[in-house]
């Protein structure tokens, strides 16, 4: 079930719990990929009882991230969470895609079985998908019968079995494959995202 609620606004940072600013955890705006540091921070916030990861001004690169219960994400103005364009930064696992359960690449943002998950702010989640789309359309020129899954691409956001999800204010763009893949989620609140 998807609910579009015009009364949903971008939550205030203070509503999302203790703030963890990524630059305090060895994640930098320097073009390098910081997947391991991002995931360690997600796990740290989870183990501390929850809170909000804050992405400040700048562009920060990562591969697949796996969010956990109580961990939210806030992307500030002029801040970008940028996905790696290298498919090896998205591990293969059992997932739902194209109407079936199979082994396929993870998304940039992954959440499974979370109750109360917020992605918000006035910043950007950018899938960095140009390289993947060029490869997909090139494949289609020499094999018009290829399927969407034949070209190895990551989704941007994948949520499975989540409830009470808020996505507000963000600019979500340039996915390598599907942008928002919501599987068996309920009570999803979106606003200006």
Residue ranges and their predicted role:
Residues 1-6, 189-193:
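Conserved small/polar residues in nucleotide/adenosyl-binding loops
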Residues 25-27, 35, 50-96, 102-105, ...:
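N-terminal extracellular ligand-recognition/capping segment immediately after the signal peptide
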Residues 42-44, 61-68, 178-184:
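Short, T/G/N/S-enriched strand-turn elements that build extracellular solenoid repeat scaffolds
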Residues 62-63, 78, 127-128, 174-176, ...:
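Surface-exposed loop/turn segments connecting beta-strands in extracellular beta-rich domains
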